[in-house]
Amino acid sequence: MSGIYWGRANAWAAYTMACVGKFLPENYLYPQYMDISGALDEQLTALKGIQTKHGLWRTILDDSESYEEVSASCGISAAMVVKGNIFHKKYIQRALDGIIPQIASSGKVMNVSAGTAVMRDRDGYRKITRDWIQGWGQGLALAFFSELL
């Protein structure tokens, strides 16, 4: 892989790991789940530290020159909601405050990057278009909003 911390990949990983606990009865009895839960805790702790002042996460998480990417922000926030850690509450609220303005009156989730292959360098990720509606952006936004209910 490229070694670049791509926002949406981290979002999918975090949300998937968070959801495992919801669907695995008595998950605390499974040592493998403890590995997943521990990895998720470490990931979310790191992600909290790089949330932007607008409450979003960037397409390249650790790159201040890359744009804020809404599908990544929705997925990461959904993972925080599912995890249910009280210390995530302020980060979830910041994300919600940043995501809501990115939803057009038509329902389109804006600032979602197009399909993304593994890029050779950071500039490849920075240049991905955000002009069109993307199913994964709509889906991750719906996941986030439904988890808030």
Indicate residue ranges for each PLM-predicted region.
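Loop-centered beta-sheet repeat module
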Residues: 1-18
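Alpha-helix N-cap and loop-to-helix initiation/capping positions
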Residues: 5-8, 31-35, 39, 68-71, ...
